[in-house]
Amino acid sequence: SVRSGPFGQIFRPDNFVFGQSGAGNNWAKGHYTEGAELVDSVLDVVRKEAESCDCLQGFQLTHSLGGGTGSGMGTLLISKIREEYPDRIMNTFSVVPSPKVSDTVVEPYNATLSVHQLVENTDETYCIDNEALYDICFRTLKLTTPTYGDLNHLVSATMSGVTTCLRFPGQLNADLRKLAVNMVPFPRLHFFMPGFAPLTSRGSQQYRALTVPELTQQMFDAKNMMAACDPRHGRYLTVAAIFRGRMSMKEVDEQMLNVQNKNSSYFVEWIPNNVKTAVCDIPPRGLKMSATFIGNSTAIQELFKRISEQFTAMFRRKAFLHWYTGEGMDEMEFTEAESNM
C-alpha cells in the first residue's frame, strides 16, 4: 500500500523489506522467530543507507508496542542497530496501548516486553497514544470520525518538529544528540510526551497567525499531549521546545521563562534551567509559526503503571502464555520484563 500510494516514489524500491507473514500480535514471533529471519535483510538496507551518509546522526524508528511485529521485531532491530552503531542516537516513536481503546488482548504482554528492551537500548522514546490522538481530534479539531490519516497527521507534525533543526537553518539549533543530552537526566528516564501547537486538522491549516505567547500557552496545555498522561499529575524533569518560523528570539525566551516562573511547582527544583529551546527559521507548510513540545515528565509513569497492572492481571493466571512459550520464550523473561518496567 505504501508503494502504490502517493509516496511510492520517495523510497527506493530495493529499500522495501517485507516478509510473507505477520507476527500475529505475538511478540515472541516478532522478536525470536519470524522477525529474526527478516532482520538481516533489514540490516543490509540500513547498512547501505548508513554508508552513504557523511555524518550519520542516528536512527528513527516508528512502531507500535501493542502488536507483534512493531514491538517484537522493532525492538530486535533496535538492539541489532545498537550493536553495529553503538555511538549513534537511537530515537523511537512508539505507539503505546491506550487505556480505553484496545486492539488486542495481549497488548500488555507485548508492550511490557518491548519497554523492557526500550529502557536499555534507546536514547529517546516518544510515547504516542492513539487515545490521546483521538481526544485531540475530537476535542480540539472537532472531527467527528477521525481516521488513522488524521492521527498520523498529528504524529507527523511532531516527528517533523523534532528533526526540523537537522533539516533547516535556524537561529538556535538542536539536533537529536543535543536533545538527548538536554532531556535525559538519568539514562533510563528517556520516555517523553510529545505535544504540538497550533493544532490544525489536515484540510484546514488555520489562517490566523498565532503569537508566541499563544503558542507557548497551547503547547504546555495538557490537552495537547500526545500520550494519555496528565502532566499536572507529575513534574517535569526537563522540557524541550522547538519553535519554527520567523519570530523574535527575545519573545521566545521571555515566554519560556514566564511559563517556568508561573508554573514553577510543575518543574523539579533540582534541575534549575530545565527548559531547552530551539528556534528554526522555516515553518511547516501552511503555517506561519509552530512549536513542538517534548516533555520528560514524571507523569509518564501513569502509562507504565496502567500497562503493568494489566500485565500482572493476566500473568498471574498465566493467560495466553502458551503462545509465547511455544515460540521458545521462557516465563522468566516475562518476570524480568515486569520488574524492569
UniProtKB/Swiss-Prot annotation:
Signal peptide: none annotated. GTP binds at S64, G68, T69, G70, N130, N152. It holds the Pfam family Tubulin. One of its GO terms (molecular function) is GTPase activity. Keywords: Cytoplasm, Cytoskeleton, GTP-binding, Microtubule, Nucleotide-binding. Its cofactor is Mg(2+). InterPro entries: Beta_tubulin, Tub_FtsZ_C, Tubulin, Tubulin/FtsZ-like_C, Tubulin/FtsZ_2-layer-sand-dom, Tubulin/FtsZ_GTPase_sf, Tubulin_C, Tubulin_CS. GO terms for biological process: microtubule-based process. The keyword 4Fe-4S does not apply. It is found in: Cytoplasm, Cytoskeleton. GO terms for cellular component: cytoplasm; microtubule. It comes from the Eukaryota. Dimer of alpha and beta chains. A typical microtubule is a hollow water-filled tube with an outer diameter of 25 nm and an inner diameter of 15 nM. Alpha-beta heterodimers associate head-to-tail to form protofilaments running lengthwise along the microtubule wall with the beta-tubulin subunit facing the microtubule plus end conferring a structural polarity. Microtubules usually have 13 protofilaments but different protofilament numbers can be found in some organisms and specialized cells. Tubulin is the major constituent of microtubules, a cylinder consisting of laterally associated linear protofilaments composed of alpha- and beta-tubulin heterodimers. Microtubules grow by the addition of GTP-tubulin dimers to the microtubule end, where a stabilizing cap forms. Below the cap, tubulin dimers are in GDP-bound state, owing to GTPase activity of alpha-tubulin. Belongs to the tubulin family. This is Tubulin beta chain. It comes from Haliotis discus (Abalone).
